[in-house]
Swiss-Prot record:
This is Protein translocase subunit SecY. It comes from Thermotoga maritima (strain ATCC 43589 / DSM 3109 / JCM 10099 / NBRC 100826 / MSB8). NCBIfam families: 3a0501s007 (TIGR00967). One of its GO terms (biological process) is protein transport by the Sec complex. Residues 74-77, 78-84, 85-95 dip into the membrane without crossing it. The lineage of its organism: Bacteria, Thermotogati, Thermotogota, Thermotogae, Thermotogales. SUPFAM superfamilies: Preprotein translocase SecY subunit (SSF103491). InterPro entries: SecY, SecY/SEC61-alpha, SecY_CS, SecY_dom_sf. The keyword Phosphoprotein does not apply. Keywords: Cell inner membrane, Cell membrane, Membrane, Protein transport, Translocation, Transmembrane, Transmembrane helix, Transport. Component of the Sec protein translocase complex. Heterotrimer consisting of SecY, SecE and SecG subunits. The heterotrimers can form oligomers, although 1 heterotrimer is thought to be able to translocate proteins. Interacts with the ribosome. Interacts with SecDF, and other proteins may be involved. Interacts with SecA.
Amino acid sequence: MWQAFKNAFKIPELRDRIIFTFLALIVFRMGIYIPVPGLNLEAWGEIFRRIAETAGVAGILSFYDVFTGGALSRFSVFTMSVTPYITASIILQLLASVMPSLKEMLREGEEGRKKFAKYTRRLTLLIGGFQAFFVSFSLARSNPDMVAPGVNVLQFTVLSTMSMLAGTMFLLWLGERITEKGIGNGISILIFAGIVARYPSYIRQAYLGGLNLLEWIFLIAVALITIFGIILVQQAERRITIQYARRVTGRRVYGGASTYLPIKVNQGGVIPIIFASAIVSIPSAIASITNNETLKNLFRAGGFLYLLIYGLLVFFFTYFYSVVIFDPREISENIRKYGGYIPGLRPGRSTEQYLHRVLNRVTFIGAVFLVVIALLPYLVQGAIKVNVWIGGTSALIAVGVALDIIQQMETHMVMRHYEGFIKKGKIRGRR
């Protein structure tokens, strides 16, 4: 492993990419400590701790604070991080599955992807502006102590909205530069850095919680099993053999090759969990606004009804998103169009039904896995009775991005005849 890292720095291009990525991440981490203008930082720290202890929103705040790398707890210019961009990307991907014009745009090659990326940035600006205004205004209005002396709520809202929106767009630009000049996907790297930066605070929470030896062993075992399970499921796929018919033109023979169609167990990544988290938080938000104690207790984070609805939503969205990004009808049509077929099946309807059946079976495993990952923090907290946010979702993102980084570094090193991180086999990057 250490020899592989040494080899990586022997390749000038790879060394420059690694250094650029580290410098970009330093800039990202510095920005997290810059508060928005007009904020009473000390008062906000007390307010955040008080809100985080509220039964209905504790899990939601912890989940979001992990994604922002702790920026929310500091109410910094990077408070929204790249979440508006992720939301915009998901919305446009879903629209592309039902709007022929967007679907055709994605099929136009590089130019189409550039146009799609431009639409994503515009939607990010719109969503980011609305989100920044809503967060700034609602928090300042309900907690006027967080506003610095001499600044009214309206002034703070304007300053905070502009600062957070500028922070999001800067991170979007920084992520694109990392993709272009660094290692891995820039947006994923920023989220990865934010998640990993929170791990020391998790360990500190566990230490201050006074865990005994047995509870420490349980906590470490859960973490190791979770990481192993994530790697296993992230890499798992069902391969369907595709055979292409041979064509003879003159003295040349075309086709006749055999390949495979991969169907990943976890097609949607963390997107089903993000969708489910957004929906399941609505009753808690309504309860907080209306101050309805019955609704607060009913949909308390970690309560039976909350976990039941959360789990069912994750299960549903896993199937829903799998069908969106892997359309059996479209794929069977493409196989037939290019002269391919699945051995033992007729092209067309039979192939489509077979792909649909395999997709359902494979997705079931992925859906059960994501439900366990989503509910893991609440199950661990219930077992050891300590408020330690061991997030399966954050681990899923961190491990996925780490695998992608290793795969890219491996490719650079193998191309230049250096021994990589893996001596046998090959890690597949996320698609």
